[in-house]
Amino acid sequence: MAVKKFRSFDDFVPTISDSEEDVPDLDASDDEMEKKPVKSSKTKNKSKKKAKQQQGSHLDEDVHEDLNPEFQFSIDSGEVTTNFAGWDFQGDEKSDEVEKKDVDLDGIIRRKGGLIMMAATGSDAEESLSEESEEEPEEGDEPGESDDEDELALDGFGMGVKRKATEENEEDEEDEEEEDDDEDDDKKTEMSQADLGKGKDEDEDIEEDTKEEMAEFYAPEEESADAKKIVHKTFNSLSLSRPVLKGLGSLGYTSPSPIQSAAIPIALLGKDIIAGAVTGSGKTAAFMIPIIERLLYKPAHIASTRVVVLTPTRELAIQVADVGKNIGKFVNGLTFGLAVGGLNLRQQEQALKTRPDIVIATPGRFIDHLRNSASFSVDSVEILVIDEADRMLEEGFQEELQEIMSLIPSKRQTLLFSATMNSKIKQLISLSLKKPVRIMIDPPKQAADKLTQEFIRIRKRDHLKPALLYQLIRKLDNTSQKRIVVFVARKETAHKLRIVLGLLGMQVGELHGSLTQEQRLQSVNNFKSLQVPVLICTDLASRGLDIPKIEVVINFDMPKTYEIYLHRVGRTARAGREGRSVTFVGESSQDRSIVRSAIRSVEENAESGKALSRNVDWTQVEQVNSLIGAKGDVVEEIIEEEKQEKEILRAEMELRKGENMLKHKEEISARPRRTWFQSEAEKKNSKMLQVLAKNKKPINSKKRKQQEALAENPRLYKKTQKDRVEYQERQYSKKQAAYGKKGKKGKK
């Protein structure tokens, strides 16, 4: 049949792929030609509608079968992305296991009447009128400032600074406005001024590294000075390869930041670096770009881990991994591994077995994998990066960091980066640095240039802080279109504030250590996508996290140090954008010293933003506080209901765990026991030492010098028992003599 059909065409030459069905039958009538495609479409796709089948011709069907209707031609080269949405916080890929269920706190709040609509405290007209009448700008204000912001009166926070005559007049006006404060409050302010003066002397008395020590430890200053002088306007002048430039272009990076311009050439030379720059200046890319550039010349077909990046928090590690993947996505064969706590351990083991080129990790999970994961080693590590190095050198990470240093090859390049890099040489010696180049782009302990720092004096109104927070968020963002981060000191405070604000109708997320890693990542992603415009978190989120377009940072509780304050406010005003921070300031000397440091930094640097005092309508705040007080019983009910649901989930988890132990007993018992570099007793001791170190008062330079002298030159003569007895007798005779003098005075 096929041969007969092909013979009817004079010019047609059949091939092996041709079939009888593909050849059109020209002898058939037009009716038959119209019916055939309808029949074939019914047999192939029964789900198609009859109207589409009758309208579609044979040519249209061929087009739909051969081309994907969702295919689109890309006119752009794909190298530049202007609308970069930020880094990915998804972590590991989802496993096949059933996800753990969490308590639906928002559902409980809705059942109790929250998250329905915003609580109203008065009309917008009344609010605007009260704000305009109460928050008038003073004489010294700049014309560009808003009505509710005043130039920060330094004496108001205990600052003994010389002021002009006009400023003295302003101070008198402020005193008249604050006549309602009692004398005790004024006395407390004077006491805090004295405390601040003392604190200032102690800060100045802190011993710094001498010039001789710095010259011996660091590389010559000429190297860092030359690196700062050379300004690279584009990444092309840094002599980077095309795959790296293409990756930077896909992220929208056009010109390097000052820290990138200074650090990348030195890092490409293989030298050790200690670098510091303000938050949001691109420090992650400053070490990732030279690392990826050097890995382009790695030996082919030899899988080994050559780079280790250590970070203090899990979220920061996930973000650094995403930065590296985006920069190196056009580099062939470049692999990344993630080793952080809270995520699937088995998945991480499988990924590390492939020996990825770059491993980003937190210290604890990294040591766990080194000791217990097969086929993972760090014998070939060439580069070690410690991000947020000042935090990693503190008490909580010292022992883990020493263990990692003992396992990683000493012949390596070490890169240290942080926004507050003020670690002493004595701390850095343990890292085995080899003449590191010190690159400090900005003055130490400085905030971003376009950051406006605002301060609110709480005085004796600590109980009004939740109401003040609600009123402030409503005023700053009435449409829930801004991202606002609220920092608190305790996890319990973050959780309770979420419930209180939820009952007032505000959608709020929380981020702290009591949440599981899945919950933490979900909170960050919801905040990033503006599903939740307000994120209440502890200092867990104060370092490194780069979420685009965070407009406002609110310090509900004051941090312990000025360095932590800088990291907190550094979540906004990143990468040249404008930002605002609002801080609730108490009457303690610690709070005032942090404010004083912030103001001093603004005064010393002309381009370092503004420091303003924000006035508050406390009558409206008290109205909100009355609403919160009325919902006090509901808050306790929500906490109790959540606790009960958590207990049920925990019982279900224990039940599943017991079933698995019975079902897979042999397999579980056959697994090797996981080990750690510390015993249980050593773990407890280290935790106790950490707690004592946090509560320990800082010693002055005189005592520190005495302790260092004793440590370096211990006593050559050891006391005997006879010496101790004689010493006790002398002390006893002194006490008796002193007691006798007191007795004689009493008789007189």
Curated annotation (Swiss-Prot):
Residues 58-67, 720-732 have a biased composition (Basic and acidic residues). Keywords: ATP-binding, Coiled coil, Helicase, Hydrolase, Nucleotide-binding, Nucleus, Ribosome biogenesis, RNA-binding. Residues 18-32, 124-153, 168-185, 202-211 have a biased composition (Acidic residues). It is an enzyme of class 3 (hydrolase). Its EC number is 3.6.4.13. PROSITE patterns: DEAD_ATP_HELICASE, HELICASE_ATP_BIND_1, HELICASE_CTER, Q_MOTIF. A motif (Q motif) lies at residues 233-261. GO terms for molecular function: ATP binding; ATP hydrolysis activity; RNA binding; RNA helicase activity. Residues 468-628 form the Helicase C-terminal domain. Residues 632-667 form a coiled coil. PANTHER family: ATP-DEPENDENT RNA HELICASE DBPA, ATP-DEPENDENT RNA HELICASE RHLE-RELATED. The Q motif is unique to and characteristic of the DEAD box family of RNA helicases and controls ATP binding and hydrolysis. Belongs to the DEAD box helicase family. DDX27/DRS1 subfamily. Associates with pre-ribosomal particles. This is ATP-dependent RNA helicase DRS1. The lineage of its organism: Eukaryota, Fungi, Dikarya, Ascomycota, Saccharomycotina.
